[in-house]
Amino acid sequence: MSIQTELTRITNAKAAIKTAIEGKGVTVPEATLLDGMASLIESIEAGGGATEPYIEEVVDGNGDITNATLHGYTIIRSYAFYMCSKLALASLSSGITSIGNYAFYNCSKLALASLPSGLTSIRNYAFYNCSELALTSLPSGITSIGDNAFYMCSKLALTSLPSGLTSIRNNAFYTCLGLDSLTFEGKPKSISSSAFKGCANITTINVPWAPGAVANAPWGAINATINYNFTGAW
């Protein structure tokens, strides 16, 4: 290989690296040498100037994730923190709109104080067996709650379900023993016959529709009395 060919190859490589770095939102001065780009790459890895979504994770000595911060994400992908039993996340970034299947499956130390206000969808098994999850409310924009979404979340302390909710799937709140009285603020299109299965402490469910308007009552909450408060709006 000639010297000229080698110089051309190096020049092209430098140009490609420069383009890649600048694509992440980090400016590369024209006079920067090839070996001087290392610090700029480190800046990207640390999140500095990055425009792509990224996650900062805290791990313990065994390599288990104990905390995480999500930057720039709108969706938490399926299995994102699957079986992270030491994850003690206290909050999620405000831009999250959907939580995927099995996203926090068996995250037994997860203690979120609230969910992002823009959240619309909680998918299947999203918070399965998150036994420390003690939410007292759900975002007003929630439209669907998937199969086993809050399965055995025994500290869940919801008192109402938002008006925009259209679907509650199978075993969505299975054995959520912290639930005792629930008020529906709107009328879902469908509620599974097992949505509240095992919720032995639910004694009252208040709904703004007439008897029979939503099938499968009492939706698995066998100890509940349903108060129908139909006003003619449905």
Predicted regions and their residues:
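Surface-exposed receptor/substrate recognition regions of extracellular proteins
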Residues: 1-63, 75, 181, 204-205
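Short glycine-/small-residue-rich flexible loop motifs, especially phosphate/cofactor-binding loops
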Residues: 18, 78, 101, 170, ...
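Structural signature of tandem-repeat unit edges
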Residues: 52-75, 85-98, 108-121, 131-144, ...
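Compositionally biased, low-hydrophobicity segments enriched in charged and small polar residues
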Residues: 1-2, 191-197
